[in-house]
């Protein structure tokens, strides 16, 4: 199954992130807050090349379905140019704003210096991260999901080993975690580039400066709505985290660790989303409506089933997960409560992300943007702001707003699926 290697890759990746977070968490709440200050900004940064990865994946999958070999090569070349260009621009911006990020995110005076240094160092390899994200998406579109899995797992193992060396052996603390992230990102980007250039489907015969205008235009048309979705979503996460960070170090640490702990439990949904994007794109390229319908039905059923199981497991192991990341009893207690709450949201979140994958595979990216923007900013952010500033709402209330956002988006994206592509 196309989804399984992607799911395994993400599971192992999150497990490595768990170890990473636990290593920093053992340094204390201030160290956790310093790293967490950059977390949502990092999501925003990563979401930009992800959008162009969707454009690459959709076009390559549809070209494979229609049997257009030359077009596959042309899309691959455009994808490489976009990956480098986007990475260079983002890296330049991040390096310029690095001194101000901690202040924007409301970090305390004790946390701000370490948070600033951490953000600077994880910004250094952004062009390599962009290469890894966009080119891995292109490779997955060929149904080769194993190679990106091996690269991703290797990079995360390297990151954990370097974390241990820099944090504990060299005693570099938060700075050591940043150095480890930087080095592993450079290595994974270079390896992905090497695999991409040697891939049998991507024969880059002409100069990278000779690009097919139609493919470039379609890359923009597909990627721009996804980019707006990701920016609306992740910038919303930044504002959301900023609102929580002003509630105190303990609350922010509990929130950040709980958000990270939950990642493992929605991996199944993201694995099927990536597979649905590829398989729906190929079905559309073949103009095979029956195959498309079968992919949609099986993807939705499998995603909801696996996310329901994930929700049950999250509820059962919530306290153990929080205890793995931190020794602080207040952080553990608060984080356990919100994780048990969000466990009931997992099936709805699964519906939301698998529906997005189906929309992307068909090249229909505008409607998901409208839904994402409305849900994030009108439901989650506005209600959280009002709740905190006018009703003294705590972290539990904040997470209720987040759950409401996910449920509404799931319903609004799932209902139109039957009419997306008619015979």
Model-derived features: positions:
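Helix-terminus/linker motif at the lipid-water interface of multi-pass membrane proteins
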Residues: 11, 15-33, 102-109, 165-172, ...
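Transmembrane helical elements of multi-pass membrane transporters/channels
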Residues: 1-20, 121, 132, 155, ...
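Small-residue hotspots at the loop-to-helix junctions and early N-terminal turns
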Residues: 29-40, 115-119, 178, 249-264, ...
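Transmembrane alpha-helix boundary and packing residues in multipass membrane permease domains
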Residues: 6, 10, 22, 39, ...
């Amino acid at each position: 199954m196309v989804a399984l290697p992607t799911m395994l890759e993400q599971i192992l990746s999150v497990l490595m992130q768990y170890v990473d977070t636990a290593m920093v968490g053992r340094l204390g709440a201030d160290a956790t807050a310093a790293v967490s200050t950059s977390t949502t900004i990092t999501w925003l940064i990563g979401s930009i090349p992800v959008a162009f990865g969707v454009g690459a994946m959709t076009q390559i999958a549809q070209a494979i379905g229609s049997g257009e070999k030359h077009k596959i090569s042309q899309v691959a070349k455009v994808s490489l140019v976009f990956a480098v260009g986007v990475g260079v621009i983002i890296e330049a911006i991040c390096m310029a704003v690095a001194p101000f990020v901690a202040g924007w995110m409301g970090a305390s005076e004790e946390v701000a210096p370490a948070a600033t240094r951490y953000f600077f160092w994880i910004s250094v390899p952004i062009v390599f991260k962009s290469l890894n994200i966009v080119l891995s998406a292109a490779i997955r579109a060929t149904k080769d999901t194993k190679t990106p899995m091996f690269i991703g797992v290797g990079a995360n193992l390297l990151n954990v080993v370097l974390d241990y060396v820099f944090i504990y052996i060299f005693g570099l603390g938060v700075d050591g975690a940043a150095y480890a992230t930087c080095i592993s990102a450079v290595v994974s980007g270079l390896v992905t580039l090497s695999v991409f250039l040697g891939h049998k489907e991507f024969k880059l015969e002409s100069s990278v400066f000779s690009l097919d205008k139609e493919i470039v235009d379609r890359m923009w048309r597909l990627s721009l709505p996804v980019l707006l979705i990701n920016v609306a979503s992740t910038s919303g996460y930044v504002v959301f985290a900023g609102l929580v960070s002003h509630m105190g170090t303990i609350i922010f640490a509990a929130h950040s660790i709980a958000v990270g702990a939950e990642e493992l439990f929605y991996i199944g949904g993201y694995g099927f989303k990536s597979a649905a994007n590829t398989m729906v794109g190929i079905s559309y390229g073949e103009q095979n409506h029956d195959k498309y319908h079968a992919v949609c039905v099986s993807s939705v059923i499998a995603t909801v089933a696996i996310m329901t199981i994930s929700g049950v497991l999250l509820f059962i192991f919530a306290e153990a997960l929080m205890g793995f990341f931190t020794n602080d009893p207040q952080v553990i207690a608060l984080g356990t409560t919100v994780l048990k709450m969000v466990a009931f949201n997992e099936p709805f979140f699964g519906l939301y992300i698998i529906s997005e994958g189906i929309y992307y595979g068909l090249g229909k990216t505008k409607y998901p943007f409208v839904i994402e923007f409305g849900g994030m900013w009108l439901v989650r952010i506005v209600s959280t702001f009002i709740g905190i500033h006018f009703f003294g709402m705590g972290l539990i209330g904040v997470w209720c707003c987040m759950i409401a956002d996910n449920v509404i988006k799931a319903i609004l994206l799932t209902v139109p699926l039957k009419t997306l592509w008619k015979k």
